[in-house]
Amino acid sequence: MTTISDLPYDLVKEIFSWVPFTSLRAVRSTCKTWNALSKNQIFGKKSVARNQFLELMILDSRVCSLRFDLQKIRNEDEEDLVDPSMKQISIPNNDDQVEISRVYHCDGLLLCIPKDNSSLMLWNPYLGQTKRIRPKNTFHRDDSFALGYNNRNHKILRLNEENESHIDVYDFSSDSWRTVPDDNPYRDELIYQSGVSLKGNAYFFDREVTTEAEVGTEDLLITGIEDYLRCFDFTTERFGPRLPLPFILPSPSFEYLALSWARDDKLAVLYSHYDTFDIIEIWISTKIEPNAVSWSTFLKVDMSLINGLTDDFLIRFEPKSFFIDEEKKVAVLFDTKVTETCRYQMAYIVGDDGYFKSVNIGVISNSHWIGGELVRSSYVPSLLQLQV
């Protein structure tokens, strides 16, 4: 009798190419041969290529997968459907269900930061492998991290606001931490939580604040705020020069910014100024290196022109994370919606032609009502072994 283990390789390959990332564990469990095959090569490239964006989000201190199917938006022949689905992902070897506060991503690997700051947890979701990383010195709540690599040797960057003259780097090849000097003269201006990994390096927002003394007092007045981009190069283990952002900033400038990854190794940056809070601009990089960047406009949206949006919504609207779909020419912006009894995680799909659609992802149930943080859009698997 023929069994599933007897199926031709090409057919097995085709089957796996259509399996969603979140269902791999169940499919692997059906057959030892399938389990071995899927852990030696990546079959899911076809599903990645489709317009089903697989996002990873932290919600209620748990890592969740959030799948958006944008194929049917702007489709005149069919109903305008998005149909998102969210699912909590169980972290292997996490029997005590450690709560996660932040997650950093690089090329299919996730670096999970537990709330108790006792250790780091490196996770390869595709292979179902984890690795605990103990600190050289005690981790702190305000530490920030980033994942990167040089010559395929992965590393972890640790930034500590209390120690601005040194940085800590964890090297996978030696399984150890080392402290290296940091000669970055603007380290105190880095916006630590903004780090995004791209092509093996990590990019952060950098802010320069200028002040002058107020006449007759000892107070300082802010006269200007300028934002830049800075790259941490994991090959040299140094920060590069300040890189320009594409906006013309008023002075003094008070705005909110968000940084995201776009397909084909590009960065996307979102900008909105508090004086014109209803205007949202998104730009994408046309060139991005540790010491150089150039930008092109992706879209500019005047939210006040969208029918049905109230002034109260526009004032409170502050998307903390986003991703873009270049083919559909839309951006998906993540924010929270507050009612008298609940807080909801929301996604807002916007286009520069006035297209707008709101999507209720679910109720935020944690006691602090903290909204979800988008970790990564268009997750692509990795075959890097964490357990040798």
Swiss-Prot record:
What CDD domains has UniProt attached to this entry? F-box_AtFBW1-like
One Pfam family in the UniProt entry = F-box
Gene3D superfamilies named among the record's database cross-references = 1.20.1280.50
Mind telling me which InterPro entries this protein's record contains? F-box-assoc_dom_typ1 (IPR006527), F-box-assoc_interact_dom (IPR017451), F-box-like_dom_sf (IPR036047), F-box_dom (IPR001810), Gal_Oxase/kelch_b-propeller (IPR011043), SCF_F-box_component (IPR050796)
- PROSITE patterns, per database record: FBOX (PS50181)
Annotated F-box domain residues? 1-47
UniProt superkingdom: Eukaryota
This chain belongs to the protein called: Putative F-box protein At3g49520
Organism for this UniProt entry: Arabidopsis thaliana (Mouse-ear cress)
